[in-house]
Every structure is written in structure tokens, then in C-alpha cells.
Amino acid sequence: MSKIESQAGELQEKLVAVNRVSKVVKGGRIFSFTALTVVGDGSGRVGFGYGKAREVPAAIQKAMEQARRNMVKVELIEGTLHHHVKGTHAGSTVFMQPASQGTGIIAGGAMRAVLEVAGVHNVLAKTYGSTNPMNVVRATIEALADIKSPEQVAAKRGLRVEEILG
């Protein structure tokens, strides 16, 4: 399903999906390939890219470049999430919650690739609805981007961190 493509500098790159698509023209079909990739630094930055070309390597290259341009910051604490979070894109809904040390990444398919490159080591996650890799990746990154640290929540509410954490 997903494989480690390369280690460019400090970024981890994973290929999530490759599809053959076709365009029907008067003379027949023109085939091309699409690639979905995720890129992360392993410590809280992650992005995804979608590339399309006549050859697989070119599609992967385009996707990797787009993923590097579209990275977002994720708030993590000791390799897990601050709080449970839900993300939705199109027909896909993802739910993630923090897990204790040693749990590992309990997630399937495209969501696992995103969490691995983002630097999340312990998480419980579930996908509901569509399992289309593109929608799952978008929903996962949207959910990760929504995570707020206790410091951010305290600042927004005008309280001290101790009051937020109880």
C-alpha cells in the first residue's frame, strides 16, 4: 500500500497510491498515471501532494514537489496528540485519539502513512465512510492541523494553562 520512497535531507517521503487513469479521444485511449504522496520531517510537519504524468516516476516527482510546498505544522506532545480530534473531507471521516507510550500507530491505509511521516508514534485512529486514499489523507491532515496545545487554548480563553488542564 504505502512504501518509503526516499529520505531527501531530513524529510521522510512516502508513496501512498499510484493509479492509472485514461482519457478517451477520437483515436482511442490516452493513459497516464497519478501519484499521491506524503512528506514529513518526523517532528510535526507534514504535507501531501498529488501528481499526474504520462510516466509513473514523473507523476511521483510532481507529487513529492507539491507535498514539500504544502506542509502544515502539527502540535504533538511526546510522540502523540494533545487531545482527540476528528477530520472530514468529502465522504471520509477520520477520528484520532492520543495513546499511551508503547501503543504504536493503530491506523490503516493512507492514514498510517500520514501519521508516520508527521512524527506521531502512539495513536488510535479510525476511518469512517469512504476509504479513498486522497480523501483520507486530506481528512487526516485537516484533523492534525486542528490540534491545539494547552498553551494555545489557554491564550485563546484568557486563562492559565493549569486552569485548562484541571
UniProtKB/Swiss-Prot annotation:
Part of the 30S ribosomal subunit. Contacts proteins S4 and S8. Residues 11-74 form the S5 DRBM domain. With S4 and S12 plays an important role in translational accuracy. Located at the back of the 30S subunit body where it stabilizes the conformation of the head with respect to the body. PANTHER family: MITOCHONDRIAL RIBOSOMAL PROTEIN S5. InterPro entries: Ribosomal_Su5_D2-typ_SF (IPR020568), Ribosomal_uS5 (IPR000851), Ribosomal_uS5_bac-type (IPR005712), Ribosomal_uS5_C (IPR005324), Ribosomal_uS5_N (IPR013810), Ribosomal_uS5_N_CS (IPR018192), Ribsml_uS5_D2-typ_fold_subgr (IPR014721). Belongs to the universal ribosomal protein uS5 family. GO terms for molecular function: rRNA binding; structural constituent of ribosome. The N-terminal domain interacts with the head of the 30S subunit; the C-terminal domain interacts with the body and contacts protein S4. The interaction surface between S4 and S5 is involved in control of translational fidelity. It comes from the Bacteria. GO terms for cellular component: small ribosomal subunit. Keywords: Ribonucleoprotein, Ribosomal protein, RNA-binding, rRNA-binding. The keyword Calcium does not apply. The keyword Lipid biosynthesis does not apply. One of its GO terms (biological process) is translation. This is Small ribosomal subunit protein uS5.
